[in-house]
Amino acid sequence: MDGIISNGSPGASVTRPLPEPLEKPPTPPPPPPEDSAAPPPPPDTSVPPPPPEDAPPAPPPEKKKKVGWGAKRPAATPLSVEELVRKKREADAAAAKPKFLSKAERERIALEKRAKEVEAGRRFKSEPSTNGTDRSGTQSPSVYSETPNGDERSIPTGPRAMRNSEVPTGPAAMRNKNYDMSPPPPPKPMSFSLTDGKGDSKRQAEEDEAAAQAALIKQKYMGTEKTSSFSAKKKRKRTTDRKFNFEWNAEEDTSGDYNPLYQQRHEANFYGRGRLAGFGDDVADTLAQKYARALEDRDREAGSIRAREILEMERRRREESTRNQLDKHWSEKKLEHMRERDWRIFKEDFNISTKGGSVPNPMRSWEESGLPKRLLELVDQVGYKEPTPIQRAAIPIALQSRDLIGVAVTGSGKTASFLLPLLVYISELPRIDEFEWRKNDGPYAIVLAPTRELAQQIEIEARKFTQPLGFNVVSIVGGHSFEEQAYSLRNGAEIIIATPGRLVDCIERRLLVLSQCCYVIMDEADRMIDLGFEEPVNKILDALPVTNEKPDTEEAENSAAMRSHRYRQTMMYTATMPSAVERIARKYLRRPAIVTIGSAGEAVDTVEQRVEMIAGEDKRKKRLADILSSGEFRPPIIVFVNIKRNCDAIAREIKQMGFSSVTLHGSKTQEQREAALASVRNGSTDVLVATDLAGRGIDVPDVSLVVNFNMANSIESYTHRIGRTGRAGKSGVAITFLGNEDADVMYDLKQMLMKSPISRVPEELRKHEAAQSKPNRGFAKKSDDSSGFGNKSGWQ
């Protein structure tokens, strides 16, 4: 029987309880289930040992190596620097080379890392501390165990007085008070990595240094970031602590009902009879009329006279005040009321700038120009409604017999600005056909133009004014025989329009003299210098008489002194001012007034410039076909190329597209040139394909589109090319095909597009390397075929 101890005799048996064990025995494991089968025996795969006679001989015993200070040490090999450097380079290359990890591998690595961190944190929390609690503050089950009676007994870990009580959690004075002292918070989870802290700190320092260096570079090039938190849109509450609030509203004020100062207002008149200080003119007029009526009522005879005088004085005062007022625009004022401020605003409106002494103010309309009545009637008949900026500024200066340099954009109406003062000048001279000797002394005025087409165009424009006035105009250009031109000069001519080369030939052949020439005009002077006409121009100007040359003193700026004597007057018009043009101006012009419209070399604001980066002839031809067939632009259309050989090829391509086309270049005869321009002007031809020969001065009306199939060699030529459209205040479009071969002009082209208010710079041009800085043109060489004259230098 359990729990009973016998002493050996059957009758005497003493029953005693067994002593309680110190600990409960462990619970035995449950028996295996009955249906579980026994595991099978292991397979007999072991090989039996070989018999003694078949066993291999035993190896000889190894000699016991000597250990200690007397043992032979292996020879030490020195470290190879090259090997260390090679290993370091391989390690750096392997570390720098990116390693591709698939998405599944990245997820697996992340899960393993997270599991390790969780396991490390769990182990850290489960480790018991010295006071018998784990890291979270709870008691460890290995320290406190429950006895069979249900009480808790623990191994003594402190004084006897504290064994059966709670563990103290504070000072003795605070133990019996109800203070809730929570256990300390658990430590933050620690992350374990394979690398030590020194490597991490070093890598972190390198990353911080690289980030600081990148921030400095960004601040240098991008500027400091604006860290202001101010926002104008942010609503702010107004504080009312300093605002005094009354206990009543303003509508409750009844002081005006019984106060006589508010009921009977006194009308005070001071600062002159009838004037109330601080009031406007309308109130002053009312008071003046009231005072005049009072005078008439008092005295019918003398009072009415005095009243009329007062009203007249008020009217003159009002006119005098309106003369100096600032609220009216210059277009609403009379000429005598214009002040210096009004003229400054007027010049800014038309982008006019003048230099020189005693320069007169520009004209606001044709009626204020000072031209004779007969010329004003012709101007109205021709159809000039409003003067252009160059006409507003140049005509008043030229009418004062001043020398003039006009710097204006192409297509700005320069022809009329020098023709009208010229006609006024020669209309005061004797008729050239009055005596025979006057016919033989040459013309009164000469007009020099760089190309034949421009000279003929000036002749057509001049005949609109000279035929009604009875003056004779003759053009002398190449392409015509000398006999034909001599026949045109048989009756004399007041005005001769010529190219410099042919005019020099006529002077050397004694077909023409300049004995009485007193008016010289050079149109497109910079173009004449580009074509090599500097020497012919100097010969022509040296052939002029010196008896009527102006003095190079301050009298040349005095209009009264210049008009008292018929001095020679010289005018020069140009789009740019190269050094050769300045040299001619200093030599032959006397104290000239300089008029600049806009900026030198700029295109007019009426031309929309489009630039397309297209490389290759085939792609450009395809793009040209798309533009012409789009129907956006109506003929006439001008296509510019750089080389004469390309003109005919492009013209053939355009004809295959279904459009009529003609060519214009230096190899054409004069008759072919005139026929080509006439066909474009009368509308029988849609497209004109030309070189820079047609880039200047060719006035084809209503050109809607200019296509630069090849970009011009200089920005000046480009300016005059696109100036063929958008003339006389009309709008136009210029499309340019650009390639890498045009790197020399990309910077200037980008600057011109940025200045134009209606044009846009394409991103390809904006980011191109050649468009970032101005190139060095010291060694730039222009093509010989670009001028359109071949080896003739444009003289004929």
Curated annotation (Swiss-Prot):
Top-level enzyme category: hydrolase
Motif extent (DEAD box):
523-526
Q: Which UniProt keywords apply?
A: ATP-binding, Cytoplasm, Helicase, Hydrolase, mRNA processing, mRNA splicing, Nucleotide-binding, Nucleus
Annotated Helicase C-terminal domain residues:
606-769
Q: Which GO terms describe its molecular function?
A: ATP binding; ATP hydrolysis activity; nucleic acid binding; RNA helicase activity
Q: Which GO terms describe its cellular component?
A: cytoplasm; nucleus
Can you name this protein? Pre-mRNA-splicing ATP-dependent RNA helicase prp28
Q: Which organism is it from?
A: Neosartorya fischeri (strain ATCC 1020 / DSM 3700 / CBS 544.65 / FGSC A1164 / JCM 1740 / NRRL 181 / WB 181)
